[in-house]
Every structure is written in C-alpha cells, then in structure tokens.
Amino acid sequence: MARYQCPDCQYVYDESKGEEHEGFAPNTPWIVIPEDWCCPDCAVRDKLDFVLIEGSTGEKNISSNNTLSVSAKVSSSDVNTEISNTTMSAEIALDVATEGQHLNGRKPRVTNLQSGAAFLKWICITCGHIYDEALGDEVEGFAPGTRFEDIPNDWCCPDCGATKEDYVLYQEKLG
C-alpha cells in the first residue's frame, strides 16, 4: 500500500488506513479516489498535486469488474432518516482509469425548473456554507435548479473542503 502527501499542509493519505471522514474505507487504493478530490485538511490542493512518498501505485490491483466494496461508519445523525452510529455496506461501481486513459467527468442532471417541487437549501456543518438548489453554483459548475442529490458524491465544500456528507438540510427560522 502507498502513501501520498499534500505539498502544502503535509497531510498524508495512507491507502492502508483510508480516510473514513472522506468516505474511503481502509485499503482504498489511490487510483479509485476521484480525480476532483481535494485535500481534506487544507482544501488547497487537488489529488493530482499529491506526491507519492512511500510504496508504489496499486493500479494493477484493480479488479476488471470495476467494483469496490465499501463499509462506512455513520457517526452523526442523518436529518432525513435518523441513522445514528450504524455500520453500512455498499457496493459502488467505479470508472477506473487504465494506463493512458483519464476518468470521464460527468455533469449532474438538472431538475426541471417547472417541476413544482420546492428547492431546498443545504448547510455545511463544518463552516456554514449554504448550497441553494434554486441558485445552483456556477463557479462549481452547477446550474440553477441543480438538486443537491444530483451533485456528485465526491464533491467537496468550496469553502472548507468538507465532504458532501457534511451537509444537512437548512431550515430558515421565520419571524
């Protein structure tokens, strides 16, 4: 297993340990981490800026079915389903880059603005950044009307680098 270091803040991603806060279980190889992932400590550097400091790349160990089994511990309550301290397992299909290829970026689908469903606001529990579905976020590439659930799961908060999982439904207080 390899270790990769952020050149700015010296954060180290260790494949053998993973990064559960970011959604990467132990033994998650560097190659399956999304290309647009950013450093969880400083949010200044992207994956491509990290430096291999120990071990070798595990690209040859990716299975041909492009599937990764993930087990994650949920440590805070989910607003909608009230999940708390539960272990969840999931099987995630991955686009795996082979030598000489790049992962294909995908744009989220945009919900029809005329659908009649109310747009919601989501707040980052780490820094307070608010994502408003009605406004979208053109800097991040999300058109007005882009639903939060349509944003890629590997998206990071543009202000602090927190994961999408660190956002909760924002409810404005009236009066």
Swiss-Prot record:
Cofactor binding description: Binds 2 Fe(3+) ions per subunit.
A Pfam family of this chain: Rubredoxin
The protein's annotated pathway: Hydrocarbon metabolism; alkane degradation
Predominant location category: cytoplasm
InterPro entries in UniProt: Rubredoxin-like_dom, Rubredoxin_dom, Rubredoxin_ET, Rubredoxin_Fe_BS
GO biological process: alkane catabolic process
Disulphide-bridged cysteine pairs: none
Subcellular location: Cytoplasm
GO molecular function, one term: iron ion binding
Domain Rubredoxin-like, residue spans: 1-53, 119-170
CDD domains per the UniProt record, alphabetical: rubredoxin
Residues where Fe cation 2 binds: 124, 127, 157, 160
Keyword field: Cytoplasm, Electron transport, Iron, Metal-binding, Repeat, Transport
Cofactor (UniProt): Fe(3+)
GO cellular component: cytoplasm
PANTHER family linked: RUBREDOXIN (PTHR47627), RUBREDOXIN-1-RELATED (PTHR47627:SF1)
Entry similarity comment: Belongs to the rubredoxin family.
Its biological purpose: Involved in the hydrocarbon hydroxylating system, which transfers electrons from NADH to rubredoxin reductase and then through rubredoxin to alkane 1 monooxygenase.
Protein name: Rubredoxin-1
Organism: Pseudomonas putida
